[in-house]
Amino acid sequence: MSSETLKFARELISRPSITPEDEGCQQLIGERLAAQGFNLESMIFEDTTNLWARRGQGRKLFCFAGHTDVVPPGDINDWQFPPFEPTTHEGYLYGRGAADMKGSLAAMITATERFIKDYPNVDADIGFLITSDEEGPFINGTKRVIETLQERNENIDWCIVGEPSSTDTLGDIVKNGRRGSLTGDLTVLGIQGHVAYPHLAKNPVHDLAPALSELINEEWDQGNASFPPTTFQVSNIQAGTGAGNVIPGRIDTQFNFRFSTELTAEKIKQRVEAILDKHSLKYHLQWKLNGPPFLTESGALVEAVQAAIEHECGFSTTLSTAGGTSDGRFIAPTGAQVIELGPVNATIHKVNECVKISDLDKLSDVYYRCLEKLLC
């Protein structure tokens, strides 16, 4: 099992599948799943390749979810080893996607192969939802697949997303939820003019400043037992022509909320717009909901994951909702229990991304135990 997980991880890493390209990764995965009796369905939406694979029909459905796409490697000269030539060195496997998340995909496959061999007649269905658009716009990937499944009443009951959830050692952290993400693109309009004649102009930077200060200092909520307080962060500001003697005619500001289950996107929008209106601004505001918050409470999936990590790693894991968003935000609203469980995330998206080789074996074992404890 050990060499098989490592071997398959290397095969996947060697494919330079930068978003939204898949570069044949899903074909490799599909071939192995087909050999285990899975029905394969390729769902291609515009530039994105997705794979929906299911073994069985009509019973409770457990699903592994993941992505074959990776972020660009940057300057390959900064890498110790070529990013798409998987290299083992001093106990680690190096390559783009080693931790995020081709190592997880390999572990999912080998765990499933072993589980089906040991329990060929288990009374449950197993599925795989794999996309090539997780690191990018996330428009034509998991979101579209879930919409398609919902249209034909295919419902996932339990889902493990293979995102690199661990912090210091494999299994120390699992994500049983994520904060919501809401982005606002705000344009405040003024009147352009000469800096020496401010009475003939209207400076939108000055107009926005008090309102922006209020937004920054607002206490949006106090969080709860599962989520930290909601945060507001300005990410981009652009104003002016570049000339030092011109009052700008507009200011463009982008900001983001990471919000808890104490709030909804609509409540945030109402509060932001009330503050802007109070300051009598002339503005345009566009919103983009990247995903609502979700939380998987204690239940069958959480308990199976906790027991599997205790069995294979020898310690109790910690449930967390910290960090960014993942494709779990598209799966959880359907009613599925969702957990993110994967390798250590210390090197993801970095030069010299790597995963501990022994963690690939252990992760496969943890996934196997999750299947066993949940479905048997």
Curated annotation (Swiss-Prot):
Which NCBIfam families does this entry report, sorted A to Z? dapE_proteo, PRK13009.1
Q: What is the name of the protein in this document?
A: Succinyl-diaminopimelate desuccinylase
What does this chain do?
A: Catalyzes the hydrolysis of N-succinyl-L,L-diaminopimelic acid (SDAP), forming succinate and LL-2,6-diaminopimelate (DAP), an intermediate involved in the bacterial biosynthesis of lysine and meso-diaminopimelic acid, an essential component of bacterial cell walls.
Q: Which GO terms describe its biological process?
A: diaminopimelate biosynthetic process; L-arginine biosynthetic process; lysine biosynthetic process via diaminopimelate
State the family named in the UniProt similarity comment for this chain: Belongs to the peptidase M20A family. DapE subfamily.
Q: Name one GO molecular function term.
A: acetylornithine deacetylase activity
Instruction: Please give the superkingdom of this protein's source.
Output: Bacteria
Annotated S-S bridges:
none
For this UniProt record, the keywords arranged alphabetically read as follows:
Amino-acid biosynthesis, Cobalt, Diaminopimelate biosynthesis, Hydrolase, Lysine biosynthesis, Metal-binding, Zinc
Pathway(s) annotated for this protein in UniProt: Amino-acid biosynthesis; L-lysine biosynthesis via DAP pathway; LL-2,6-diaminopimelate from (S)-tetrahydrodipicolinate (succinylase route): step 3/3
Q: Which reaction does it catalyse?
A: N-succinyl-(2S,6S)-2,6-diaminopimelate + H2O = (2S,6S)-2,6-diaminopimelate + succinate
Q: How does it assemble?
A: Homodimer.
Binding positions for Zn(2+) 2 per the UniProt entry = 100, 135, 349
Q: Give the required cofactors.
A: Zn(2+); Co(2+)
Identify the EC number(s). 3.5.1.18
Residues that hold Zn(2+) 1 according to the record: 67, 100, 163
